[in-house]
Design a protein with these regions (language model features):
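Long, contiguous binding/interaction regions
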Residues: 1-41, 46-99
Length: 99
């Protein structure tokens, strides 16, 4: 993957939906795989795009998640290795967003 992968993890689906909405509106990114449901109400999602867009999106998503509910973690991986992308089911068909 030439671009970046942005990850966000929240407690509760509503916080994650708010975070994803903010991320997709804030920058030229697109979802990269399904929402992952973990134990205890923890959920996570990924976006992909160019590095600067993913950084801006994750920052906006983290702020939204914290405002709505509980942000657990947020992280950007520039140029993730192919094994990481495959392991987590991220769609890596392009490095940029599709807006």
């Amino acid at each position: 993957m030439n671009g970046a992968l942005g990850l966000i993890e929240t407690f509760g689906l509503i916080s994650l939906i708010g975070a994803m909405d903010a991320m997709l509106k804030a920058a030229n990114v697109e979802p990269a795989g399904p929402i992952v449901k973990l134990d205890g109400g923890v959920v996570s999602a990924m976006v992909r795009g160019d590095v600067s867009s993913v950084r801006a999106a994750v920052e906006a998503g983290a702020e939204a998640a914290a405002r709505i509910g509980e942000l657990r973690a947020a992280h950007v991986i520039p140029r993730p290795g192919a094994a990481i992308v495959r392991a987590f089911g991220a769609d890596a068909s392009s490095g940029g967003g599709a807006k």
